[in-house]
Design a protein with these regions (language model features):
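Basic, polyanion-binding surface patches
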Residues: 133-139
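Short, structured loop/turn "capping" segments at alpha-beta junctions
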Residues: 126-131
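Short, structured beta-strand-loop surface elements
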Residues: 59-116
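Short beta-strand segments
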Residues: 21-58
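A generic structural signal for nonpolar/aromatic side chains embedded in well-ordered alpha-helices
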Residues: 18, 65-66, 120
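Short amphipathic C-terminal alpha-helix that caps PH/PH-like domains
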Residues: 113-125
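Conserved small/polar residues in nucleotide/adenosyl-binding loops
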Residues: 144-146
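Extreme N-terminal tail/first-helix region
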Residues: 1-19
Length: 146
């Protein structure tokens, strides 16, 4: 990051940004072409180690791209605020963001899918759902771990 004084490195500050975001942009690269898709997510954070969970269909472009190249980029942003000025060039925009890289893998084990779906639902709704409240057909769809 060019402006080091603005870099967020403290785990609690990173967690605050993640908590405020409900959408993450997931970026892939294939044969020189970039593909970015917004997705809902859940997460787990232990110390400085962040794991993202994304639910998706069992087939499609995301799954195909992960199978070809598991390297991904992520971006999420929140706390948007326009800073007004008297002149056009005095305007600015404030926001908090998280940008990173990782390796995506497709989760195969049903029990891991259920755990990850629980993380997604907890992050998106603020509620903890019992396993019995999960649709078995949805559990069998793909889940991505980053």
């Amino acid at each position: 990051m060019r402006r080091r004084e603005r870099e967020v490195v403290e785990p609690n500050e990173i967690r605050d940004i993640i908590e405020a975001c409900k959408v993450c942009r997931l970026g892939f690269c294939e044969e020189g072409e970039v593909y970015i898709v917004p997705v809902n997510f859940g997460y787990d954070m232990k110390g400085k180690e962040l794991t993202l969970y994304i639910h998706c269909a069992g087939e499609g472009r995301k799954i195909d791209l992960i199978r070809k190249n598991a390297k991904v980029g992520i971006e999420m942003d929140c706390h948007h605020e326009l800073a007004e000025g008297d002149l056009a060039c005095q305007y600015s925009y404030y926001y908090a963001s998280l940008i990173g890289n990782g390796h995506a893998k497709i989760v195969e084990e049903t029990y891991k899918k259920k755990e990850a779906l629980g993380k997604i639902m907890e992050h998106q709704t603020g509620k903890i759902f019992d396993e019995s409240e999960m649709n078995p057909k949805l559990v069998e769809l793909s889940l991505i771990h980053i």
